[in-house]
């Protein structure tokens, strides 16, 4: 009888052709998908060309999404995108997404059905951990590893220890997946899951939409984790059936699998949470913020919170209201499809009427790229995932992190606050 394993151990063992892998083991495994963007792929291309192969291992298993500085913000980014475009054409890469059909990579891939439960996914972007929401093992790598994987279809891994998060209860009020992950990071710290797998289970999952789960898995890296992964349930399967025709495999953790820590969290007690500068662990609930923190800019979007559910919540709050005079509110639908759906539902009109500006899908200001860079002394509230020093612009600017509900309400108030201050009771649905 084989030894008990966690979800992550099982997926890694399966892809390495082994019956069992142990935390700390160094393994080579076959990957199902290799991902790169316009920032990381050019470096990978240079390394790939040094290998001396004349083709990629599988043109269907490589995905390249120019999303960080697109539409091209300057000559340098245009050159990088040109290099990536030419590489995709030369090697006939099936899943290269040009500006007209692109989106922020970590929202686009699940939407396109490119990741399914049981997959082993590597991406030259730290937020590749997002796909754990689908019950896949997905993790960020460097451009050199991307190059090697494009040539061989394999990558090396150190099997991580795991932390088990047993969620119970139901979301209440304006609490969302973003608040849950900010609460967890505030609890364990930015190195609380260092090189570990964050594995989510428990009856509380029923209360979490797929968009909530993508948000939670997305920010595993902000706790230092190797990956975040959710137990597959009916919601996962329903999502996969709607978006993909790929075969999938469900890996459930063994009952007696070993974890370095186990946390039980009652999500019904989690309140909307804000991360203060300059780390995602510097959290306070909205009730603990006693002073008025005035802001210059609100950003709603990103690979963390740019999905349709996020936009619906923001629109619900902004409908019939105006963004505070002198404040900038920028909204980024995460993909073209999400943008189109938001148009159909009238959300874009609500945003524009409220005084927001709506951008094409791009990572934009999240990494200090473009479309909303902060000046010296400016302060932003964003639904993004990082608030390090200088993350969104000038080293002397500040970024606070929140959910779309808090961000939208704050855009109206002019300071960090809750929809409750606008007389809106929480959504119990």
Curated annotation (Swiss-Prot):
Keyword Lyase: yes
GO molecular function per UniProt: 3-isopropylmalate dehydratase activity; 4 iron, 4 sulfur cluster binding; metal ion binding
Cofactor: [4Fe-4S] cluster
Record keywords: 4Fe-4S, Amino-acid biosynthesis, Branched-chain amino acid biosynthesis, Iron, Iron-sulfur, Leucine biosynthesis, Lyase, Metal-binding
Pfam families (UniProt xref): Aconitase (PF00330)
Biochemical pathway: Amino-acid biosynthesis; L-leucine biosynthesis; L-leucine from 3-methyl-2-oxobutanoate: step 2/4
Catalytic activity, EC: 4.2.1.33
Transmembrane segments annotated in the record for this chain: none
Cofactor binding comment, as recorded: Binds 1 [4Fe-4S] cluster per subunit.
Highest taxon of the lineage: Bacteria
Binding locations of [4Fe-4S] cluster: 303, 363, 366
Family according to the record: Belongs to the aconitase/IPM isomerase family. LeuC type 2 subfamily.
Known role: Catalyzes the isomerization between 2-isopropylmalate and 3-isopropylmalate, via the formation of 2-isopropylmaleate.
Protein name: 3-isopropylmalate dehydratase large subunit
Organism: Caldicellulosiruptor saccharolyticus (strain ATCC 43494 / DSM 8903 / Tp8T 6331)
Gene: leuC
